[in-house]
């Protein structure tokens, strides 16, 4: 085990949760690591880390146990947690949807786990169309967050399906496509009547996506002083020069 094995610090952070021996191996790499906090452990689906926090009396929400199990698709562990009386809430379904774990979501719903619009939004964020389709077929609500997070992830097919099936959208769809540099998503959204505002240009500037900004402006997207101020703050000098040369407001 060497430090060369860990490009992502999150991978290193997972290992101490495995065993005492693994903690010692991590220490031998000479790398420093931070213990996973509750939110990060859930995001990573690291149930063992959440359980360790629980044993140490450091868990702020007992529901985090079910969320972590759902996020990583650990159905048997989720079943054990529920049999032991562990509470859950709508975030369990949302985390299962984000991870693309349809079987976990189906079991949770069959056992009366609540859900809300975040289940659809998280399925969209994860690019899990089958999960989104099942959720909608079974009555899960959705809102503009589904289109927003589909755009954020660059999941054009997901966005197209959502719109074809009546999902609402708003300016946040264009904003998230611009933020992440998904020009094809922005183009499709704009062509199909999605509203936009100066936030689209500002977030293109934030991400340093000059091609997105140029296309947005060529197609009538408004901008204001935030485009320049954000581009400067992020040190996107080519974008600053282009925006100034093309009349972006500074006041």
Q: How does the language model describe each region?
A:
Residues 1-251:
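Ankyrin repeat (ANK) tandem alpha-helical domains that serve as protein-protein interaction scaffolds
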